[in-house]
Regions:
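Structured binding/interaction patches within domain cores
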Residues: 105-106
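Short, charged/polar, low-complexity loop and linker segments
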Residues: 37-41, 95-102
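Catalytic adenosine-cofactor/nucleotide-binding cores of aminoacyl-tRNA synthetases and other
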Residues: 1-87
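Conserved, charged catalytic cores of large soluble enzymes
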Residues: 60-100, 120-140
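Conserved small/polar residues in nucleotide/adenosyl-binding loops
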Residues: 142-148
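Aromatic-residue-lined binding/catalytic grooves and analogous aromatic/hydrophobic interfacial grooves
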Residues: 109, 113, 123
Length: 151
């Protein structure tokens, strides 16, 4: 791809077709800063579908649905100190901020994106493995009536 081959990429057309956030994400994630990169519209679409729609979109959809269904749309308060250091999400969460900060400082935007995607994928895997919706037990009629009877 290049001017001499008369097949340059028009970023304005790409943005008009897919939106600036999608274009920005792809180039930050897939093409290392300061290095020539290779662009394919097919690859562009595949990356967006796999990482943003499937991985991130799926995580947001599942998490928000569970928050709405089980916690009245609120984020429950959790004491982070009560979560074991060996918990897979905590292990990543502890190091993620520093890792992304260092990646940004060294212009390693591709690495920063990949670090965040590891967290997203680990969250999805955790949800798949633990099936939290099956662990939730609504308050039974007995639990509601016992305090009343005791009074």
């Amino acid at each position: 791809m290049g001017k001499s081959q008369n097949n340059t990429l028009n970023p304005f057309e790409l943005i008009q077709k897919y939106g600036s956030d999608a274009v920005r994400y792809y180039f930050i994630k897939e093409i290392e800063f300061g290095v020539d990169g290779d662009f394919s519209e097919t690859r562009f679409i595949n990356v967006l579908n796999a990482e943003l729609a499937n991985d991130l979109g799926n995580l947001l959809n599942r998490t928000l649905k569970m928050a709405h269904k089980y916690f009245n749309g609120q984020i429950p308060k959790i004491n982070g100190e009560e979560v074991e250091v060996t918990h897979p999400l905590k292990k990543i969460g502890i190091s993620l901020g520093e890792e992304v900060t260092q990646a940004y400082a060294s212009l390693g935007f591709t690495h920063a994106c990949e670090a965040v995607l590891i967290l997203v994928r680990t969250c999805n895997k955790y949800i798949d493995e633990t099936a939290p919706w099956s662990l939730y037990k609504p308050v039974s009629y007995t639990h509601l009536t016992l305090p009343t009877i005791r009074s």
